Amino acid sequence: MEPAFGEVNQLGGVFVNGRPLPNAIRLRIVELAQLGIRPCDISRQLRVSHGCVSKILARYNETGSILPGAIGGSKPRVTTPTVVKHIRTYKQRDPGIFAWEIRDRLLADGVCDKYNVPSVSSISRILRNKIGNLAQQGHYDSYKQHQPAPQPALPYNHIYSYPSPITAAAAKVPTPPGVPAIPGSVALPRTWPSSHSVTDILGIRSITDQGVSDSSPYHSPKVEEWSSLGRNNFPAAAPHAVNGLEKGALEQEAKYGQAPNGLPAVSSFVSASSMAPYPTPAQVSPYMTYSAAPSGYVAGHGWQHAGSTPLSPHNCDIPASLAFKGMQAAREGSHSVTASAL
């Protein structure tokens, strides 16, 4: 008849997964082991897995008990206040001590035994969370005691510490008798200027500075005075000077100056009325007829030789007859316009 619950292992024994072995079987395993029977033989005889037999015997040799561990129970608390106190003492005596050294000292001093001594990770967590904060608080308190009193805040802008011109002027210029002095704490904070404004580029004071400086007996440049500094107030040049230079010196240099060969002198120039207008280039019609061969056409300059014709500017005859009717008409039209303009 098959059992109502449980499973059958490889040896034919019945076990319930997740449940401890009955105490009677546990006691029998220990008795057979004390008789000198090997664990593998005990496993075959009692039909219990070899791992279960080895685990029960190891726990009995370590603790002397055959009872199973707490099912679903929590591990007993090992970081008691007494242990934490001793760990703090060790850390204060030797700040560079390691967690494994603290664990060895707890065992050596008899604070803990091998069953309830905290692990290295637990000691590190205690040092980081509990003792570390206390050590930092103690260092902060000692630093705060030696720290001098904070200086009073300056009456400047809290964002940009820009010096106040009124305070600086009051520190340099003595106050004349009979005039009440402006205290430094009453000085208005100067706003942060814009680096692209005309006022800052020209160095003109702001409206706030002007309002305060109007009450002082000393003269300060106003905005109106800057407008008077125009070009019309500068002394005009003398009539006998050209561009700020003496006219006589220029004439003397022009008189003795010699120009290169083939070019007119500097002082001698031709009036505009006696010069002919520069001939405009002729507009060539895009539909002009061209009857000559490509090799017969010679490109010439705008100027013409004395003995040349319009069709042969280099005084050479073109064998083929060219029909430049559009060009000739445009050239005649430009000459007529030039003559009428003169």
UniProtKB/Swiss-Prot annotation:
Gene Ontology cellular-component annotations: nucleolus; nucleoplasm; transcription regulator complex
Which residue intervals are the DNA-binding region?
4-130
Q: Where are the transmembrane segments?
A: none
Q: Which keywords annotate this record?
A: Developmental protein, DNA-binding, Nucleus, Paired box, Transcription, Transcription regulation
Where is it expressed, tissue-wise?
Answer: In the embryo, expressed in pharyngeal pouches and derivatives, developing vertebral column, tail, head and limbs.
Which SMART domains does the record associate with it?
PAX
- InterPro entries from the UniProt entry: Homeodomain-like_sf (IPR009057), PAIRED_DNA-bd_dom (IPR043182), Paired_dom (IPR001523), PAX_fam (IPR043565), WH-like_DNA-bd_sf (IPR036388)
Quaternary structure per UniProt?
Interacts with KDM5B.
Name the chain's protein. Answer: Paired box protein Pax-9
Source organism phylogeny: Eukaryota, Metazoa, Chordata, Craniata, Vertebrata
